Regions:
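Short, conserved loop/helix-junction motifs that constitute active-site signature segments
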Residues: 166, 186-200
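Residue-level detector of functionally pivotal "anchor" positions at catalytic/ligand-binding pockets or at interdomain
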Residues: 230-252
Length: 279
């Protein structure tokens, strides 16, 4: 909107502003005057400015609601990002091409742009919030190191090429007994959501009784290494109380050794839970 307005030095945003377009204030006097680091506009993380040191880990400010499109695009040296619980929106290609090793999306996220983490070839794990309804197109495309992904029961739709060329994907866990719709490729009766994932080496874990539905669903029908699990076992783990020690569970809520291969539900000593992938 104001890109290239070289004399624009001051910006005041309305509290009702819904979003800021990618690069909207690039090439302005305002941006040139900002110090190096994460540049903020009100509650928006607009972009990263300056040179980033290798192995950088950043924590966005509490109260940040939006990460603008391409805000950290091609920040190769960004190895970690701490996203605050206040965050609601991640823009298109916001973290594409970064060196992130893992990412955990906060629970209030309700909108994620296409290709948000595309090309993050070092990304090993990603945690999606339980209220997410859509995984947008190309969200994790070309994340070659991504070993496992857990798709919440709330997810109903997965955009085209969301997991395109995720060559290292060994385990997909979908908690929805109804297969999420995989976006068709330009109106065709096939999809590229999982194109490049090797079905010979990737296990699909799905709720008990849903094998027939997944086997008949476009996109999901490519997987033949399928295992059913009882989601209620995990719910029991998540609702349990703190025990004062760290305990590992499988997807059926059964206690397992900490070095067992696959997806673990880890209940920490304080009662908090997280999902991890053990190779």
């Amino acid at each position: 909107a104001f890109q290239g307005c070289a004399k624009l030095a001051d910006i005041n945003l309305s509290a009702s502003l819904a979003g800021i377009g990618t690069g909207a204030f690039d090439g302005t006097a305002w941006l040139n005057a900002q110090p190096d680091g994460v540049v903020y506009l009100s509650t928006f993380a607009y972009k990263y400015k300056g040179t980033m040191a290798e192995g950088t880990t950043l924590a966005l400010l509490d109260g940040t609601t939006d990460v603008c499109g391409r805000a950290f695009n091609n920040c190769w040296n960004l190895a970690g990002i701490d996203l605050p619980e206040s965050l609601k929106t991640i823009g298109k290609e916001a973290f594409s091409g970064t060196g992130l090793l893992s990412v955990s999306l906060p629970s209030r996220i309700d909108s994620t742009g296409e290709g948000a983490f595309s090309g993050c070839d070092k990304l090993v794990s990603a945690t999606l919030p339980e209220n997410l309804t859509t995984i947008p197109a190309s969200m994790f495309s070309r994340c070659y190191a991504l070993a496992a992904i857990s798709i919440p029961a709330s997810v109903e739709y997965i955009g085209n090429e969301a997991f395109y060329s995720c060559l290292g994907l060994k385990e997909i866990t979908s908690f929805n007994p109804v297969p999420p719709v995989c976006e068709p490729f330009y109106g065709e009766n096939w999809t590229m959501v999982f194109d490049g994932v090797n079905p010979e080496h990737c296990t699909l874990k799905i709720p008990t009784g849903s094998t027939t539905s997944y086997a008949a669903a476009v996109g999901w029908d490519m997987f033949y290494l399928c295992e059913e699990f009882d989601p209620s076992g995990i719910q029991g783990v998540l609702k349990g109380k703190a025990s004062g020690k760290t305990v590992h569970y499988d997807l059926n809520g059964r206690m397992i050794l900490s070095n067992a291969k696959g997806i673990h539900i880890v209940r920490e000593a304080d009662g908090s839970c997280r999902k991890i992938w053990v190779k």
